[in-house]
């Protein structure tokens, strides 16, 4: 799986409009979500 495929899966799981912010380090991606109740 390439980076674009991983990004698409994440966006589909949490909802594109549900992401308020994002941060990353070498091993983790941290997302700030508007509503955690709608996560698939």
UniProtKB/Swiss-Prot annotation:
The keyword Kinase applies. Keywords: Kinase, Phosphotransferase system, Sugar transport, Transferase, Transport. One of its GO terms (molecular function) is protein-N(PI)-phosphohistidine-sucrose phosphotransferase system transporter activity. It catalyses: N(pros)-phospho-L-histidyl-[protein](out) + sucrose = sucrose 6(G)-phosphate(in) + L-histidyl-[protein]. Residues 3-40 form the PTS EIIB type-1 domain. Pfam families: PTS_EIIB. InterPro entries: Glu_permease_IIB (IPR036878), PTrfase_EIIB_Cys (IPR018113), PTS_IIB_1 (IPR001996). GO terms for biological process: phosphoenolpyruvate-dependent sugar phosphotransferase system. Disulfide bonds: none annotated. Its EC number is 2.7.1.211. The active site is at residue 25. The phosphoenolpyruvate-dependent sugar phosphotransferase system (sugar PTS), a major carbohydrate active transport system, catalyzes the phosphorylation of incoming sugar substrates concomitantly with their translocation across the cell membrane. This system is involved in sucrose transport. The PTS EIIB type-1 domain is phosphorylated by phospho-EIIA on a cysteinyl residue. Then, it transfers the phosphoryl group to the sugar substrate concomitantly with the sugar uptake processed by the PTS EIIC type-1 domain. This is Sucrose-specific phosphotransferase enzyme IIB component. It comes from Lactococcus lactis subsp. lactis (Streptococcus lactis). The lineage of its organism: Bacteria, Bacillati, Bacillota, Bacilli, Lactobacillales. The gene is sacB.
